């Protein structure tokens, strides 16, 4: 058997090779191009095990050769630190540490590194779309803040709701005779409107790409507060609820479970774990009032806990409760028990009508009944 630890970069990767029944160690660096990849392929086979640390290009990289080897393990960065691979020095040393960990795990049969699930191409595409989604939202927010700041500096104390309302935008553009102020406001307004248009086009593509997961979307949107886009975001993060041991594992992966440290009789509650994905909880946290108001049980619980817990703690706990319910819905493949048939039907009818505009993203299976 051959054990390969790979330290991956954007333009090259360094491999450390260890062998069964041998202390021999070989290290080689390949370019991340056609020539380098073919040279790498010649060094691996069906008796080869590979360990790669998860980075931005890892999933696309391992897809190239996963069928050529016995197994590819993609390791979570935070999890690697917890099992004793800190203090990175050089590419060769990094690759060697990974290879040693891999060999120890395979030879002993004792799992030391929990692998990261390599998402299918469709999920990777959704995640890429949502990365752009978050970038555009941040840029829109920054642009609005700058316009608001300019107006306040010049004694125009309008609220953001007024400034960026459709009716007031023309007035805001012509609000001052000062050339430089007017120039900046109009420049930023042009930028804002361009970003908003791009954002709308992006949402359209997200909805189209998410249509592959219609059954899950139909289940998730049965919960008050979850839109089609939020449902697609949850799917992009979790892939499949069946890969999680239980609801606690599911909630932890979505960064809603705090880390707990204890010594003797002292227990410290720390921030939520970072060894997971944060897209879903970011969008879900924006709809907490809808979740609370649409669920009498949650509403009573929030009122009770809010009497003796800080608002931030209650907010995160509510997120955790919602995520736990989402897990049960996906696991059991059933609608939310407080779902509103009228609102849910309206959401799904609008989505299916949207998809009907492009037959590429719509099948007879999901057609709207007359």
Label every model-predicted segment.
Residues 100-128, 166-178:
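A short, charged helix-loop
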Residues 32-49:
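Short, basic/hydrophobic alpha-helical segments
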Residues 11-35:
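Short glycine-rich, Thr/Ser-proximal phosphate-binding strand/loop in the N-terminal lobe
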Residues 1-19, 98:
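Gly/Thr-rich phosphate-binding beta-strand-loop-beta motif of the actin/hexokinase/Hsp70
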Residues 218-222, 228, 234-312:
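Phosphate-backbone recognition surface of nucleic-acid-processing proteins
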Residues 130-217:
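Glycine-rich, often acidic, oxyanion-interacting loops/wings at catalytic, nucleic-acid
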Residues 265, 304-370:
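Low-complexity, acidic/Ser/Thr- and charged residue-rich accessory regions of DNA metabolism proteins
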Residues 73-115, 266-275:
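Short alpha-helix plus adjacent loop in nuclease-associated cores
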């Amino acid at each position: 058997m051959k054990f390969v630890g790979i330290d991956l970069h954007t333009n090259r990767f360094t491999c450390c090779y260890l062998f069964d029944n041998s202390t021999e160690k070989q290290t080689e660096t390949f370019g991340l191009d056609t020539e380098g990849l073919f040279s790498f392929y010649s060094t691996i086979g069906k008796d080869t095990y590979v360990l790669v640390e998860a980075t931005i290009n890892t999933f696309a990289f391992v897809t190239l050769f996963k069928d050529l080897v016995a197994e590819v393990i993609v390791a979570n960065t935070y999890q690697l630190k917890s099992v004793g691979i800190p203090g990175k020095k050089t590419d060769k040393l990094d690759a060697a540490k990974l290879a040693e960990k891999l060999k120890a795990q395979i030879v002993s049969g004792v799992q030391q590194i929990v692998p990261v699930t390599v998402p299918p191409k469709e999920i990777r595409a959704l995640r890429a779309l949502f990365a752009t989604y978050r970038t555009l939202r941040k840029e829109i927010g920054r642009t609005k803040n700058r316009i608001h700041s300019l107006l306040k500096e010049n004694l125009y104390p309008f609220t953001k709701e007024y400034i960026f309302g459709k009716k007031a935008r023309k007035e805001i553009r012509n609000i001052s005779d000062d050339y430089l102020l007017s120039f900046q406001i109009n420049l930023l307004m042009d930028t804002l409107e361009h970003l908003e248009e791009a954002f709308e086009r992006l949402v359209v593509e997200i909805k189209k790409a998410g249509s592959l997961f219609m059954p899950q979307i139909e289940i998730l949107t049965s919960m008050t507060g979850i839109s089609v886009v939020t449902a697609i975001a949850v799917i992009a993060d979790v892939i499949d609820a069946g890969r999680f041991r239980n609801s606690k594992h599911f909630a932890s992966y979505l960064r809603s479970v705090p880390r707990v440290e204890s010594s003797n009789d002292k227990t410290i509650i720390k921030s939520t774990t970072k060894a997971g994905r944060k897209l879903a909880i970011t969008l879900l946290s924006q709809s907490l009032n809808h979740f609370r108001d649409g669920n009498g049980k949650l509403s009573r619980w929030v009122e009770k806990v809010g009497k003796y817990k800080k608002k931030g703690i209650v907010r995160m706990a509510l997120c955790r409760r919602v995520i736990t319910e989402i897990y049960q819905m996906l696991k059991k493949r059933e609608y939310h028990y407080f779902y509103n048939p009228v609102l849910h039907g309206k959401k799904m009818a609008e989505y299916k009508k949207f998809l009907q505009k492009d037959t590429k993203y719509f099948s007879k299976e999901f057609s709207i009944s007359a």
